[in-house]
């Protein structure tokens, strides 16, 4: 199966208001990162993750302006495209991979690391490359 889209949320809240970001949230005491991803995915999108996998755990340095000492767990799963209703987090859109791979995109949240995570997932899962960024 060719996966050509990623579900992103256009955030309603700061930080990154009106910017696209992955689905996520904070770990509740006693939860594993995978358990958190399953819960957050369902709470925000009503999508049940079946086979979530941990890609990377990253701790932001203490001198990072936005996220000092924050731990980021990047977890992914493959799901069928389904409509997700707008809610308190924002508007959900299935965006083409090329949108994420655009190095000049100004409306993607964070440190523009989303495209790097997608590249790594493709390598791990041996997914054929079907995107090319052309200026």
Can you describe what each PLM-predicted range is?
Residues 14, 27, 57-62:
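Short, catalytically relevant binding-site loops at active-site mouths
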Residues 30-31, 108-111:
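Short, solvent-exposed loop/helix junctions and linker helices
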Residues 60-88, 93-100, 104, 111-125:
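Active-site-adjacent beta-strand/loop module that shapes the phosphate/pyrophosphate-binding cleft
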């Amino acid at each position: 199966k060719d996966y050509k889209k990623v579900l992103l949320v256009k955030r309603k809240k700061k930080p990154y208001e009106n910017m696209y970001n992955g689905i996520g949230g904070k770990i509740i005491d006693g939860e594993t990162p995978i358990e958190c991803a399953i819960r957050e995915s369902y709470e925000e999108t009503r999508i049940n993750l079946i086979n979530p996998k941990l890609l990377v755990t990253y701790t932001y340095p203490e001198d990072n302006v936005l996220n000092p000492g924050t731990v980021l767990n990047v977890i992914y799963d493959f799901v069928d495209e389904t409509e997700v209703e707008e809610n308190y987090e924002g508007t959900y859109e299935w965006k083409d991979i090329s949108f994420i791979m655009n190095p000049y995109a100004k409306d993607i949240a964070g440190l523009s690391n989303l495209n790097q995570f997608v590249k790594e997932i493709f390598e791990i899962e041996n997914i054929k490359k079907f995107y090319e960024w052309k200026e």
